[in-house]
């Protein structure tokens, strides 16, 4: 597979990286601002797809400078994430109130951080609005169906945000690379997907597609971490080990996918995630810029007075309390 700059050298797609702009003033200091400058609140990307560039964003560090860029500090990361979480809640309330339908697709290299990003998107919102779909291998019955058929029942209804942790694009990535699907079926799939996604968008759905890109050295480090850390070993599969050796096969499959399925109605957005913290913030900020939400007026909520009941007495029940070890 390729590094960040090779990504666009091999592919006809122009990597889209929307510049981050403030959503509205909140009296807080945005990421990267120097002390004493005007605060503009959380960073939210413009709804525009942004300028077409080759490689990484024009304002991103290049070459050795990129490698030398220090990882974001946890304190600053959590500060910015709190602001973005508040915006995600505002987006959620707008989706519920307007009946909007939002479908988000996450694809990318193994270890690129899809699961971690999705976790940070969903950890402060309602699971009744935000729902994650991660389908397992198809059953024999599903294999006999139209390929995209098993994904359709999971599409969002009014007032829902559905996040696909991998999607119908398995047919364009892992399946051809691992030899699960013959080339003619992959070609046919790539020919049909634009029309399929056009129908999704024409039905009123907001479709957002992300590709998470991680460099080869960072991927190696993350896989070794999974091998050596008993808390992460469950993340490591035989498929990860097989695909690790096929970096450039995945690169070619990715490039073919971009060429065939990057459309004006369903474009691909590329996120560089060697720095997980920066990557997550950039993705969430960009996501907020793709949904035309407006914050709803907040209710003035006050707790009611709790009623007294002087007649109530705690019963003498044989309650089993858990040990208080901490």
Predicted regions and their residues:
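Glycine-rich phosphate-binding loop of ATP-dependent small-molecule kinases
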Residues: 9-326
């Amino acid at each position: 597979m390729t590094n960040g700059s090779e990504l666009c050298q091999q592919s006809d797609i122009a990597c889209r990286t929307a510049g981050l702009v403030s959503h509205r003033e909140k009296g807080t200091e945005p990421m990267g601002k120097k002390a004493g400058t005007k605060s503009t609140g959380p960073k939210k990307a413009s709804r525009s797809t942004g300028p077409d560039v080759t490689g990484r964003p024009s304002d991103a560090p290049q070459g050795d400078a990129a490698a030398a860029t220090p990882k974001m500090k946890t304190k600053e990361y959590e500060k910015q994430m709190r602001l973005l979480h508040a915006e995600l809640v505002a987006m959620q309330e707008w989706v519920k109130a307007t009946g909007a339908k939002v479908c988000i697709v996450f694809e990318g290299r193994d270890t690129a951080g899809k699961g971690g990003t999705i976790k940070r998107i969903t950890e402060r919102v309602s699971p009744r609005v935000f729902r994650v779909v991660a389908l397992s291998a198809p059953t024999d019955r599903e294999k006999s169906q139209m390929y995209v058929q098993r994904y359709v029942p999971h599409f969002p209804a009014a007032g829902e945000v559905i996040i696909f942790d991998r999607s119908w694009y398995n047919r364009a990535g892992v399946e051809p690379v691992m030899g699960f699907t013959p080339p003619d079926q992959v070609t046919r799939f790539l020919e049909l997907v634009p029309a399929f996604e056009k129908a999704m968008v024409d039905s009123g759905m907001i479709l957002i597609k992300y590709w998470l890109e991680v460099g080869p050295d960072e991927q190696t480090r993350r896989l070794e971490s999974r091998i050596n850390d008993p808390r992460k070993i469950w993340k490591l599969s035989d498929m990860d080990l097989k695909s690790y050796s096929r970096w450039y096969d995945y690169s070619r499959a990715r490039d073919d996918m971009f060429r065939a399925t990057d459309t004006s109605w369903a474009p691909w957005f590329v996120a560089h995630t060697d720095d997980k913290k920066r990557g997550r913030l950039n993705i969430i900020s960009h996501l907020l810029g793709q949904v035309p939400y407006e914050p709803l007026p907040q209710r003035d909520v006050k707790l009611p007075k709790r009623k007294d009941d002087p007649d109530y007495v705690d019963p003498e029940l044989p309650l089993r309390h858990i040990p208080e070890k901490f």
